[in-house]
């Protein structure tokens, strides 16, 4: 959570996590837990941004976070606040605009160059030649999306970190209806980010379902539920994995023995013609699937 002094972060944090903070606590990062559909998000209330020069630690927190909540005080200049936050993030090579490709380059001592992902208008040899220009001879290049050579080159110098974000317009109960409607519409026109309204006094005004589901979707995550082969009981708390994950990835995440001794799995899902369906290790999972692994 990022915002300027008095932006309503602490009230929002309390409503999201149910955790009360004592006076002055916001001078240090404060963690809390947001529960949603069996998934637990760690929410961190950060100290208010006082100046660009004092925001280094906050930007380090933002870079390490999976997603951002930008709190904007509706009683102040909302456009200046949002622009200032986005500029500060951009200055620290953090973007809230989803790029066409995300490239990570992991240097290593041996093994040559391995590319995982898709290229546009370039070949593997083009990438190898480019990396050699920067004295990189051994590396794993991971691509999410489809990357150009320019994307690869930018990643060499430290690519932008993409963070899904939502804008929380706080203290909206202090504005009249027409002013709030006009402000919210203009703000939504000025950014591609979803804008949510929060009264700062009533937690019921918070649309947790919309916020959590948006972040979950933008992070490209899915939920799968495990079924006990002995009892038939389905675990209420899901396993969270990246979209595109396979059955064997879940086996590895549950226990190394399931991964090593994997035989097959059964999948329960409305999308399947036959449910349950017996599948192998490379079967791709979807959100809401129920999985039973036999080893």
Which residues are covered by each model-predicted region?
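Canonical P-loop GTPase G-domain recognition
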Residues: 98, 102-105, 111-138, 142-147, ...
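Short acidic beta-strand-loop surface patches of small beta-rich interaction domains
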Residues: 264-281
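Conserved G1/Walker A P-loop phosphate-binding module
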Residues: 1-108, 116, 121
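Short, contiguous acidic and Ser/Thr-rich linear segments
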Residues: 235-246
């Amino acid at each position: 959570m990022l915002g300027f002094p008095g932006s309503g972060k602490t009230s929002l944090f309390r409503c999201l996590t149910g955790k009360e903070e004592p006076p002055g606590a916001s001078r240090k990062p404060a963690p809390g837990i947001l529960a949603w559909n069996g998934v637990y998000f760690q929410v961190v209330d950060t100290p208010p941004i006082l100046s660009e020069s004092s925001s280094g630690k906050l930007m380090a927190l933002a870079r390490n976070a999976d997603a951002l909540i930008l709190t904007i005080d509706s009683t102040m200049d909302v456009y200046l606040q949002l622009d200032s936050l986005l500029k500060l993030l951009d200055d620290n090579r953090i973007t809230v605009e989803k790029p066409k490709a995300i490239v990570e380059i992991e240097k290593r001592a041996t093994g040559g160059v391995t590319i995982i992902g898709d290229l546009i208008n370039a070949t593997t040899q083009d990438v190898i030649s480019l990396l050699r220009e920067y004295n990189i001879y051994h590396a794993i290049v991971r691509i999410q999306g489809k990357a150009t050579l320019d994307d690869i080159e930018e990643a060499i110098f430290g690519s932008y970190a993409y963070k899904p974000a939502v804008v929380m317009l706080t203290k909206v109960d202090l504005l009249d209806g027409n002013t709030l409607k006009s402000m919210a519409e203009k703000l939504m026109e000025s950014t591609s980010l979803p804008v949510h309204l929060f009264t700062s006094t009533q937690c019921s005004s918070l649309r947790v379902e919309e916020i959590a589901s948006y972040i979950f979707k933008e992070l490209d995550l899915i939920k799968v539920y495990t079924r006990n082969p002995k009892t038939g009981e389905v675990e209420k708390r899901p396993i969270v994995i990246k979209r595109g994950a396979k059955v064997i990835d879940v086996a590895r995440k549950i226990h190394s023995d399931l991964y090593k001794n994997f035989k097959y799995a059964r999948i329960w899902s409305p999308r399947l013609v036959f449910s349950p369906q017996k599948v192998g290790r490379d079967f791709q999972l979807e959100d809401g699937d129920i999985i039973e692994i036999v080893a």
